[in-house]
Amino acid sequence: MVYKISQPILSLFKDNQPANSITVKEMPSFQVILGNLLLPKAQLWFSQRHHNGLRLYHLLKNFSGLRLPLLKPNVYPVFSRFPVLIEDQQRLSRIKLRLLQAGIECSSFYGQPLHHMFDLGYKKEDFSNACYLARHLLTLPVHPWVNEGDLERIQDIFYEELR
């Protein structure tokens, strides 16, 4: 929500063209120290993200009107966020609003497809899958500070809006 409010100002500092190259720089010592302090906790955080992602999958898998990630056997996904495709855009808007009102930071992730942001020589209707994702994708938090109550609140909101 904070990002959405500050987006007009932040957009002034964003690139408006694809990058031509990537510059590798040395990290400041503060970042090195911070990284060394946090790195030992990484495995715990990855495990919690994995657990929360699987829990959301099981809480939402029986709802119609949703498409969830395909979880293959013998694969250990460590979710950055949990992606959900919601077929009905009006329901997506209501779900997003209710989640935000409940204090659950969800996001559309892609405001628009890349070929709409930059003049890359493509037509607006090109890349139909990217266009669909931009209109129907909602991502849910799975970070280590998401608790079982948050996950159940997410399920309740989806249930109330999709029944």
State what each model feature region is.
Residues 1-163:
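PLP-dependent aminotransferase class I/II
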